[in-house]
Amino acid sequence: MPILARNGGRDEGNAALELVVLAPVLLFILGLVVAAGRTSIAQGAVDAAARDAARQASISLTPGTAQAAALSSARAALSRDGLDCNPVVTVDTAQFGVPVGQPATVTATVLCQVPLSDLVVPGLPGSRTLRFTFTSPLDPFRER
């Protein structure tokens, strides 16, 4: 015997219909939340990597070792945070030529592509490029 709703009409199949209509919407929202979370976590990791890279470059004695130390430090920071993005690290070492006793800085920029293609969300790009820059002072009294 069919179940009758309070208003006297049939109530059969409404739950299945609601599920069919709402499931794609809920999955879309869930995908957006996951993408936002992944991007937010990656932003923090890339920012920390840029800071670490600039600090390591600032304690190096030559521009060549500064570049190598910055790249190594950025990769280690991203690996520590669980982000696998093959970073591009650029270091501005132009101020290594500033005479001792004068203030100088070194700037590190880290670029990282965060993959989003594994999330099946319509309209979402396949990846997002994150870029962070940090400037660290060079010791004005240390020979460069």
Predicted regions and their residues:
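Alpha-helical assembly-interface signal, strongest on the long, hydrophobic N-terminal helix that forms
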Residues: M1-S72
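Short, conserved structural patches
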Residues: P2-L4, I59, P63-R144
